[in-house]
Amino acid sequence: SFGGQANISKYRNMINVKEIRLIPGNHDDRLVSLIKTDPLVRSSFILCRDINMIKCHGCIFILSHMPVRDDIVDKLLSGRNIDNTPVILINGHLHGSKYPDNGFKRYFRVDASIETNNYLPYNILDIIKLYNESEYI
């Protein structure tokens, strides 16, 4: 993920945030292993589950590496009182490729792979603006 263990601290120190929550992807096996075994690397990241749900700025965000199918989202939201709360799915993995045709249509989604935003991180407020400008409103 970082071009080798020696680069982890260098790149981590370039990211100006207090915490980095890592949702592991298919290229992160070595990094996950280091987080579990190396105290210095462990202090740089918070290792998260494959699918994470947070509420922020009045929206529900479902964060994952792989895109999450609609039926799985339905199960995640089942029994929750969300009323008309916007639900926004953010994933990586696709690197700008299209979402599959089946099972990925009912929720607003953002492929947050770095290739989709000029190799810059997305701002959560920009994602909410995209949602507000979409047909999912």
Model regions and ranges:
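Core catalytic region of metal-dependent phosphoesterases/phosphodiesterases
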Residues: 1-56
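Conserved beta-sheet core of the metallophosphoesterase superfamily
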Residues: 21, 39-137
